[in-house]
């Protein structure tokens, strides 16, 4: 289905055309008509109908009209950039609200919120701080959107979100996007949604253009493998993902000692530092970015040739998000995952999830012997360790327990 088949304002269609968008993705095709009726991916699925409704309703001075809640400042910035493109021909104002930076950033955000903004894109903690300290009025918000809601809950934002909801009017349109539906998400949905239309879309598999492979190794062999890898491929634009800030710092330091063009991205960096690193990486001033999952979702850089998972991600969906940074815009890409003994069970779940046996690269002989790939043994070992702790992971079956009253979407 094409965008010009939708009942969108001409100025919005002009913005879509200027961004070279023509055909809708499945999530856009399913969600845009519903959002329009009731009130590059999922961001456009809600921003386009939102802009359309804001334009048709006309401007409203000194009021916040819509709030888009996101887990990270990086995603907030990306959505703001996409909104700028779509609304290029529209009289729409946006304010981006996230932590970090200096006092000037806080003052600028406060000014935008107090003067009124058609669209506020915010992280929960920062918006709650402005509500508490800046006298922000959200009583006229008509559209409340939660993007990556599951990730926000993983980061501990449930209470912040519920506090923000208390400042919103009862009559509003609420839209929630979530990659997964754990009990906590269903609880949130039950509390903030009213008779929602539920749309389920199959989780996408990795791009077929990505060549996926893995090294089965001991944990102590990972650093020698990475150094060997970049001795032979020093100029490939690469993201190396690790689940630990300390590992990110250690990796970046080790690669810099090899005179490689590398930078680190993690939550200890100030906002200005993060933006400078991403700009240098996008402009190829650095070739290798070592990062935590802070950049696994939503970073729009088309020419990344290689993704390395220094650690196996905890969830299969995180794996897809990580390797999805390569093979973009019809390009080819390579994804390599380092799998230690303890990570074999997690890696096997990824293979099951994507329904593919990932090729195991033989380790260079000079790096020594490698462990046997036997993930079932590690799964059995993990099950044995946890069999006495089931109450931590499963709800009691008693009807009197609060968990059983959470309901569904």
Regions found by a protein language model. Give the residues of each.
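Conserved helicase RecA-like core
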Residues: 2-371
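Basic Arg/Gly/Lys-rich low-complexity intrinsically disordered segments
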Residues: 59, 283, 351-409
């Amino acid at each position: 289905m094409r965008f010009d088949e939708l009942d969108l304002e001409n100025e919005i269609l002009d913005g879509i055309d200027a961004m070279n968008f023509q055909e809708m993705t499945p999530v856009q095709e399913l969600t845009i008509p519903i959002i329009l009726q009731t009130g590059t991916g999922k961001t456009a699925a809600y921003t386009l109908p939102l802009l359309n409704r804001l334009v048709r309703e006309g401007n409203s001075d000194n009021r916040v009209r819509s709030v888009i809640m996101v887990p990270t400042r990086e995603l907030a910035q990306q959505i703001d950039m996409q909104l700028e493109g779509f609304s290029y021909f529209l009289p729409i104002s946006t304010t981006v609200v996230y932590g970090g930076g200096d006092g000037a950033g806080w003052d600028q955000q406060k000014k935008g919120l107090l003067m009124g903004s058609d669209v506020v894109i915010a992280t929960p903690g920062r918006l709650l701080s402005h509500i508490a300290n800046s006298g922000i009025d959200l009583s006229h918000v008509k559209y409340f959107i939660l993007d990556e809601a599951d990730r926000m809950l993983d980061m501990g934002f449930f209470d912040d979100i519920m506090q923000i909801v208390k400042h919103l009017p009862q009559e509003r349109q609420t839209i929630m996007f979530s990659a997964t539906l754990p009990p906590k998400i269903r609880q949130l949905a039950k509390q903030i949604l009213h008779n929602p239309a539920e749309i389920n879309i199959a989780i996408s598999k990795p791009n077929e253009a990505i060549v996926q492979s893995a090294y089965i190794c001991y944990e102590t062999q990972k650093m020698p493998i990475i150094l060997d890898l970049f001795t032979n491929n020093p100029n490939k634009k690469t993201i190396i993902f690790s689940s630990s800030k300390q590992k990110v710092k250690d990796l970046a330091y080790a690669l810099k000692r090899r005179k490689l063009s590398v930078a680190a991205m993690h939550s200890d960096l100030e906002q200005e530092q993060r933006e400078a690193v991403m700009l240098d990486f996008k402009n190829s001033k650095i070739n290798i970015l070592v990062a935590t999952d802070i950049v696994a979702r939503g970073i729009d850089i088309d020419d990344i040739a290689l993704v390395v998972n220094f650690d196996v991600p905890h969830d299969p969906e995180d794996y897809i998000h990580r390797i999805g940074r390569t093979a973009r815009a019809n390009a080819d890409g390579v994804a390599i995952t380092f799998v230690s003994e303890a990570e074999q069970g997690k890696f096997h779940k990824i293979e099951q999830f994507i329904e593919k046996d990932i090729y195991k690269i033989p380790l260079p002989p000079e790096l020594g012997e490698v462990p046997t790939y036997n993930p079932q043994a590690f799964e059995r070992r993990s099950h044995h360790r946890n069999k006495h702790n089931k109450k931590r992971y499963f709800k009691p079956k008693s009807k009197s327990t609060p968990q059983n009253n959470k309901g569904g979407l």
